[in-house]
């Protein structure tokens, strides 16, 4: 028996007004993130995974669940258009999203030896080292990879 998808939106829901019925999922995921756990959202296409990630990025939701910027910074990145790109280009794009996300919440100063956020390619060791430098020890960078 095939179930009907309850979501009528054709794109991920960005407006919290239209996001409802997922309080239990948001609560569970936020608790796992706050405790430093990794989380995987798995489900059929267009079931609301991207909308759920978008909801977690809302400042009011983060405040409600204790995901405060001085402890962790949530960074959303959609990989939808990146499947045919070399890994170095993907790492550079994620790095740019991280720098933008940290700049938006305005927590702490950036270390001076980080890669330029406009770099076009980034190898994995440099990407990994940069993530550690920008996040540790003041904050954890939480990547919400869609």
Residues covered by each model-derived region:
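Conserved adenine-nucleotide phosphate-binding loops and their immediately adjacent elements
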Residues: 1-20, 25, 108-112
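Phosphate-binding P-loop
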Residues: 30-36
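Short, well-ordered alpha-helices that flank and scaffold nucleotide-derived cofactor binding pockets
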Residues: 31, 58, 62, 96
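Conserved nucleotide-binding/hydrolysis micro-motifs of P-loop NTPases
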Residues: 36, 47, 81-84
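Hydrophobic anchor at the beta1->P-loop junction of P-loop NTPases
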Residues: 41
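P-loop NTPase Walker A phosphate-binding motif
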Residues: 44-77
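Conserved NTP-binding/hydrolysis module of P-loop NTPases
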Residues: 74, 79-109
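Mid-core helix/loop region of P-loop NTP-binding domains shared across ATPases and GTPases
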Residues: 100-145
